[in-house]
Every structure is written in structure tokens, then in C-alpha cells.
């Protein structure tokens, strides 16, 4: 639903893409294909993964084994995410402790992204041009503008593709009256996408119905022909 605006925009490209949605509680990562078959948009999903690595988890991680602190000084989780130095000044906690905990957290984000992209490249879409020319990655959600997530997404994918082309989701053409900024739209993109007519989204193919990119596997009955799903 989130990519509804993209597929109806001038930015649209065929082929492999990734979406990384940074919410309050979770980090959602998925690779998918933008394709068209018989005049209908088709979106095969390849590798989805959801981890408890959202912005609230980032803050909770900073308090693990932390020295005594005043809870009243903890920042409001509904406000923009504070970086290491800002968080230290706000809470009075040692900056080196927060930096250490942040390194642990960003390593987990890096590993999650790498795992999804590596599995996609090795088993799901080996011949995609994205592996040589660069992978388009939508980084969205309330935490998408946080530098740590941006760096971790880029580093997590660099062993798979030479460039991670981080992109913002464009507004849906039917939402011309949306008064917020492009950054604001990233926070509400799920709701905006779901508000569209379901038939306008095209055909969504769950990952479980898309065969691995491996000729040694026998075709599973009732699954779409993979040659019809993979953009060439």
C-alpha cells in the first residue's frame, strides 16, 4: 500500500526494489519487484523481515545497564529522535555509554538489512540489474530521517550492491491536498496507501507464492509462473 504513490509517478522503474519502514516499535524490511503483466501492475514480494528495532527500541536500548538516572529527564518518544550527544545532554547519562549502546543497536539494524538483501540476491532474484547498478531503497516511517538508520541501511546493503539509492516515497497523485511536507508523508504513508482503492494497487503476490530463483527447485502447484513475475 505504501508504494501506491510511487508506481503511479514519473519516478517509477521496473525491477527490484526494497522498502525499509522505521516505526516506533519495529523495523520492517522487504524486497519486492515492480512489474507489469497484461497491463496490470504486479508486485511480487521476495524477502520480508520484521524486527523490534524501531525508534522506541533505540531509546530502550540506551538504558540497558545505564547508570542511575532521573526518569523525568527521559525524552518524549513522540518527539524527533535525539542523536547520541543530544540524548546525553537531555538525560545526563554518559555520552560514551550511549555511544556504546547505539553501536550495538545499529549493528543489529545493519545485520537485518544485510540478511534480507543477501538472501534476495542469493536465492530470490540473482540476475537483477540492481546488484550491479544500484538498489532503489525506500526509507520511510517516522524514523526514516534518523541518521543511524540511514547509515545502517547503506552499510547493510553494500556487500550486495555497489550503491543503495535511498529514496523517499512520493505522495500519491490523489493526495494533492495533503498539506504536510514530504517528510511528514513518510510518517503516514501506510495509512495514505491503505486509503486508496484496493484495485488501484495492482496485484500483490505474497513471498510464499513466489518461487526461489533456483532451477533445481520443482515448481509448486498453483503458484504464478516465476518468469511472469520477474522483470527482465
Predicted regions and their residues:
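Conserved phosphate-binding/catalytic loops in two-lobed NTP-binding clefts
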Residues: 1, 155-190
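Nucleotide/phosphate-binding catalytic cleft detector across ATP-hydrolyzing
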Residues: 1-18, 192-212, 219-232
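N-terminal phosphate-binding loop and flanking beta/alpha elements of the actin-like ATPase fold
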Residues: 1-15, 146-148, 153-160, 167-168
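Short, conserved secondary-structure transition motifs
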Residues: 1-7, 54-59, 173-177
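Generic recognition of flexible, low-complexity loop/linker segments
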Residues: 4-8, 15-19, 120-129, 134-136, ...
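Gly/Thr-rich phosphate-binding beta-strand-loop-beta motif of the actin/hexokinase/Hsp70
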Residues: 7-45, 194
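Conserved structured core elements
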Residues: 20-23, 99, 103, 107, ...
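Phosphate-binding glycine-rich/basic clefts of nucleotide- and phosphate-handling proteins
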Residues: 31-152, 213-222
